[in-house]
Amino acid sequence: MNALARENGTYAMVAMDQRESLRKMFRDRGFDDSHERMRMFKTAVARELAPHASGFLIEPEFLEHVQPFVPRGLIMAVDLLEQERGGIVEDTRLDEVERVPEGVVALKLLVIWRDDDRRRERIEMCERFVALAERHGVLSVLEPVVREDQQILAAARELGATRPSLYKCQAPRQGDVVARCREITEVVPVPWVVLSQGVPPEEFPLAVEHACKGGASGFLAGRALWTNTLDAEDPTELLRTQSVPRLNELIEIVDRYA
């Protein structure tokens, strides 16, 4: 796990593999959603944030553009998203890549967990994903996402059992959050980190604190770090003056509580 962890064994990672959801953010702000704008933004985030992080997540389409700016912990998404323009991710499939680019140290798979008749199918996909990463000699980062807050633990119990290298989990939002995070720690047999989807950026530091108090080992966050820069034609200055301090604040929280 040293390929993604910091010296003290914790994780402070940046997610930049958003696809249609990021395009929609650009459109909502009056910008075009072209490949060039996506490339520009993702490259800027990598250039400014990756040097401060222990890992950086990107999809294959933009990997070669960000790789020069990622000094360590390069994670490649291998999820194929079923997502209509402007909509949410409805489902995912595993892209069983035949080769992993040099420099990539981990693969990541997003899974939409539901309590339906396809649960066994999703478990098998996660098992294939873990085996795929092992076959390529890299780590596996599994990211199950649920629609209802109360489903987080069920998904963790079911899919954490496939034993990825690292489990990426939503932050519980209701009830005794620290106690709920302890329950996640009890059922997931591998280290886990919290993601920022669904959490307002200003509330994410507290979510990280609660998660780490409950046994999480850090975070893999995207929107909580860079959403505030989307209104700028060139996000560089805001990334430097707002996103980097925000990332460092989260790292301090992890160091204190993880």
Task: Name each region found by the language model.
Residues A133, L159, A211:
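Hydrophobic pocket-lining residues that define ligand/cofactor binding sites across diverse proteins
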Residues G55-P60, A106-E121, A154-V177, V194-S196:
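Catalytic beta/alpha-barrel core
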Residues L139-E148, Q170-P172:
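Short, surface-exposed recognition loops or helix-turn segments adjacent to catalytic cores
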Residues P172-R223:
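Glycine/small-residue-rich hydrophobic helix-like segments
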Residues P68-E82, R122-L142, L153, V178-V199, ...:
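Alpha-helix-loop-beta-strand connector modules within alpha/beta enzyme cores
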Residues W113, V146-R147, R173, L225:
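Conserved beta-strand edge residues that scaffold enzyme active sites
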Residues M1-D116, E202-P205, E209-G218, R223, ...:
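Alpha/beta catalytic barrel-like cores
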